Amino acid sequence: DMTSMFSACTVLAELKVPNFNTEKVVSMFGMFANNKALTSLDLSSFNTPEVTTMKGMFSGCSALTSLNISNFNTAKVTDMYGMFFSCEALPSLDLSNFDTEKVTDMYGMFAYCKALKSLKLSSFDTKNVKNMSFMFFYCSSLPTLDLSGFNTENVTDMGAMFKYCLEMEKIDVSKFNTEKVTNMRGMFSGCRKITSLDLSHFNTENVTNTNTMFFSCDALTSLNLSSFKLEKVTDMGSMFFACEEMKTIYCNYTWKCAESTSMFAYCSKLKGAVAYDENKVDVQMANPETGYFTKKTPSGIEKSVDTTEAKIVDIYSLDGKKQTELQNGVNIVRMSNGKIQKIMK
């Protein structure tokens, strides 16, 4: 057990451990935590085949600029909670050798790594991870992040996952499985340079909190939330607060929520079924009929019909029942020119 072994050695500027035998060590929890003066650490000699927890191992090493953990064996590690939390001066991390198959907790793993500009996670196996909240919180210098290999099928908490990634211009979460996620509070809050986000596939059926989810996403001009039903959400407060360049939010659903204070505040360019009104900024405007949402037309469906060329002769529902007028949603129509097509009302 090496738990907190060198923890809080606040004036320790140099540490050399080349002869440490660590092959039977099970816990390295907080081993170097809060060594605020340490600038360089070479742990390339560490053999860690039995270690199960690296929770907070380097947490608070705020002066650390060089860290060699290239030979770490993490095959048995289950807990990486806050492992590099507040390593504020660390410019790069290459964890491409990490085996994370058994890890269940990555809460705040890289939070407050403010100087981090390069982060390699290509080998990360995250299929058993349940908590990714605050994982990249305040990685304010990180310009890009490759999460294409992330398996999030068991994640329940993504709260503040990318919050205050101030320099991030693009985050590819197109492969995220969010079926079990309950918390998305502040997930992209303060991501001021992101110009696009593909969330069209997100499953939000179990989400209960989206408060400040897109707070101050200053560069976003549109969002496709067409899959967002949010039927279980109880807090949508400030969800789109200060999305100053936002013009269009695509969503076909009407949202309802108990708490929605300032939901659309300072979104002056937003327009959906109606133009933006600074006096109407709560969940009552979260709909595509009388609110700020715009309906997303499915591929292959005509949004409207040019009645100057052809007129609607017959209208049918998707189950083949004849209708007297266009219904909300998808309609099958026969035109006066004989053409059969689908249109969305």
Predicted features, each with a name:
Residues 1-298:
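Negatively charged
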Residues 296-315, 319:
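Residue-level detector of functionally pivotal "anchor" positions at catalytic/ligand-binding pockets or at interdomain
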Residues 328-330:
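Extracellular Ig-like/FN3 beta-sandwich strand-entry sites
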Residues 332-345:
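C-terminal tail/sorting-segment detector
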